[in-house]
């Protein structure tokens, strides 16, 4: 950071298709007399695809305030699956292209003293539509797969010592695709 430029941090993340993908997991009704409730036959432990995320974060200090902003783009790689159907007894091979995601956020942190800081920020993640294509068939857009998950975030950080920090936060969903509220407490350790 200098008089003309903020601190700029570049990031890059790779997501591998490990675990069980969500595609092809069959749904069933645990109670044959009640078809209002369906449950998956097993739970996914991954997203089933390769994804690459590149981002930039900007930080500017105006003591005792720090302004920050970030932007990131996630590219999801298309992948073919032997079965994407959720219907028991049905197999539907298809190529799936999850929608790419643009993430934007900005906020500020206020240092109350040398150990405590408050923060407020706004963030949004906009996902384009997911597309599927059956072998030899046309590419179709999955209805309702475009999302915008926006949230207003409040946090407090307290440095216990030079290694341990306590981070408490409350996130309020600002769009239908975001969780209504997320409340959390973290204890990051720095080596």
Where do the PLM segments sit?
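Outer-membrane beta-barrel channels and translocator barrels
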Residues: 1-5, 17, 62-65, 113-115, ...
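Transmembrane beta-barrel strands of outer-membrane/channel proteins
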Residues: 10-16, 54, 69-75, 120-124, ...
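Hydrophobic, aromatic-enriched interface-forming segments
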Residues: 46-84
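Outer membrane beta-barrel transmembrane domains
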Residues: 80-191
